[in-house]
């Protein structure tokens, strides 16, 4: 057995990569809560945007400092998008204290590389060590991206789109549910692109046909749905499939004005209203989440006003807003008409204020209703209180439901009365 102290930065896809690595070393792995008790310290980094790069580097440097005072120093391994973006050779010259660099070019090779560095004798076998508890788990269905948005570094870091075969994903889904997982959340850079590169006859629907019948699965949630991939055919399949598929749509629209979408390299999404209307044609009561970028090069007051009007009209259930940052190596970083930071930040904050009012109004409708709540974990401070989620709340990104009463425990799916609503959260009693 080896003890591991791990840090996963960035998105859920990184967390899945960490879980696969730790579950595939060919020996039993014991997670520990302090690096002084670890045989190996693993940092899975993010490098998607500059703040993530800075956080990753800061985390590595702070960890090196913490390790320097230990009598027995664990092996330090660094993986993830920071390594993919800057390369192991360049990073090693700046951070020689790191023992092992795990590059993104072949994530499947990580277990063998780490096992070799640890001098482990057991055979490396595919596996997964869950870190999310019994209620939910992410299922990463592909890696990389075939799109070339002008602001995005992902294709250069993660490479082109590569689907994981359906039989592999079905086996993993069955294993996760057998461990007690109630909700599977499908993630990828573009979930709707699954199957395009491996000849799946009906694309994502082919995979869903394999996953939906998994015995014991209570919820199946889809994240990162590319606007162009939400075809009428896919939406029709999803409507007809029904439970355990939840009518939750995470669609990163990024903007609403065609001028800005064109500059973003997303001309296929130049009419986001049609995307929203298409979803609501099939799912009138769908929960809609989106992410938007403000302050993109060339964004004028008129462009921003159009975006604000779009948000007010559409009334998303959940929304994230990001102030644009120029990323080295992307076409957008070289564009003229860069927007001042103070303007970008004001636009972000103002748009989130608009969304806060919308969210509060939409959640208030649920007060007095009865909802199924999937219980995630005990509250850290209040005994007897747990946190969970309704079908319209995705883990770790949306609001939560505070729930208490008989039978409330992690992994339980309970019927509860919504007794109070807040801006982003709910309060429920069984």
Curated annotation (Swiss-Prot):
Major site of localization recorded for this protein: cytoplasm
Enzyme Commission code: 2.8.4.4
GO cellular component: cytosol
InterPro entries hit by this protein: Elp3/MiaA/NifB-like_rSAM, Methylthiotransferase, Methylthiotransferase_CS, Methylthiotransferase_N, Methylthiotransferase_N_sf, NA-bd_OB-fold, Ribosomal_uS12_MeSTrfase_RimO, rSAM
Residues at which [4Fe-4S] cluster 1 binds: 11, 46, 81
Any Pfam family: TRAM_2
Nucleus keyword on record: no
Domain MTTase N-terminal: 2-119
Subcellular location: Cytoplasm
Free-text comment on the cofactor: Binds 2 [4Fe-4S] clusters. One cluster is coordinated with 3 cysteines and an exchangeable S-adenosyl-L-methionine.
Cofactor(s) essential for the protein: [4Fe-4S] cluster
Listed transmembrane segments: none
Residue ranges annotated for the Radical SAM core domain, each copy included: 131-361
Gene Ontology molecular function terms on file: 4 iron, 4 sulfur cluster binding; aspartic acid methylthiotransferase activity; metal ion binding; protein methylthiotransferase activity
NCBIfam families for this protein: 30S ribosomal protein S12 methylthiotransferase RimO, MiaB/RimO family radical SAM methylthiotransferase
Family the entry assigns: Belongs to the methylthiotransferase family. RimO subfamily.
Protein name (record): Ribosomal protein uS12 methylthiotransferase RimO
Gene for this chain: rimO
